[in-house]
Amino acid sequence: MKIDLLVGAEEFWARMRDDLAGARDTAYVQTFTFEGDRVGARLARAMRDAAASDRRLLVDSYSRLYHSDRIIPGPAWRDRALRREVKLTERWVRRLRGEGVGVRFGNPLGPSPVRLVRRSHKKLAVFDDRVVYLGGINFSEHNFAWHDMMLRVESPELAAHATEDFRASWNGRPEAFDREVGGLRFISLNGRGNRAGFQPVIEAIDAACYSIDVVSAYLSHPFTDFLARARRRGVRVRVLMPGENNKSNLARHILERAARGGFEVLRYPGGMSHMKAMTIDEELLVMGSSNFDFMSYHILEEHVVMTRNRALVDAYLDRVWKPDLASAHADAVRSSIGTRLGDVAVRVGAAFASRLALPQGDFS
């Protein structure tokens, strides 16, 4: 098994583009958002030109509702640039289908609240039952501009599990499973058994001896409660979030929970960070597509990777955590009217998500 940590969208794309071009049998890509801007066009052209006999692109239907972090059926629709981007996206979908690339929008939108919020947040690519990509990067210009990362893993065994996962999602029947491959624990959450699926992460937090370091823009309840519980045991807890958070209520919630729970908050100064990772005692790395938030905990389809692979943990610490920490500044962690209001808003959202959660399914 060969594992590479790819930091930044360009580093990720350079590797994935080559793997996609070299695929001969299967080329599967799953993403939360796909937009017809320059980044989306790059992916579309690469999939169109790929030699693989079975090429498929699976996009969550979130992309039919949101573009560039703006709601399409709303005031933003008056923006000519947004309308053009939506039309370009539709045009690329038609082109790809015309060139023999399967394109599907998963989890169709519907009028019920469950049909609106139940999304697949996975970011996955699998090529020739050999190479797997997992992580947090979506295919749009603004996502590529964010600070983020992906894993590239060469492993036929992991690729077999990832292919199984992709095909199940493609058929509208996402699976939940927990697999161990070469020191990587690969957990797939299907939006039904998520609380059970997250249990290994919660147990690891509860077993922490001296440190838990989290990078997430959208960290929220109940994970903030788990971190506060660890802090009460004397574990040092640090949360690194972006200086420019595109979801302000979540930033306020993090500050309020930190003020109450006694953990440290630091701000990444380089714009928006979309990183999502946790290290426990600098020995265990948890990463994937989950933001460690209430939507992941209750509703979203996600991937979680847990590993004690020393080379990978060190690569993450050396390439992400340590440099980001060195450039970050400590936030003044204190409760205020603003942080309390943000905290209330997030907790109301978490309660709503809990009520909308589907019955627990099988988790194996």
Regions found by a protein language model. Give the residues of each.
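Long, C-terminal catalytic modules of enzymes
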Residues: E283-L285, S290-S364
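Beta-propeller domains
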Residues: G191, I202, S216, S220-T224, ...
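Short, contiguous pre-domain boundary segments
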Residues: M1-K2, A328
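Short phosphate-engaging motifs
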Residues: F12, L158, F223, L312-V313
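Catalytic cores of glycan-processing enzymes that make or break glycosidic bonds
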Residues: F198, V235, D362
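HKD-type phospholipase D/PLD-like phosphodiesterase module
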Residues: K2-D25, T33-D206, Y210, L240-E283, ...
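Helical hairpin unit composed of two closely spaced alpha helices linked by a short loop
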Residues: R229-A230, V235
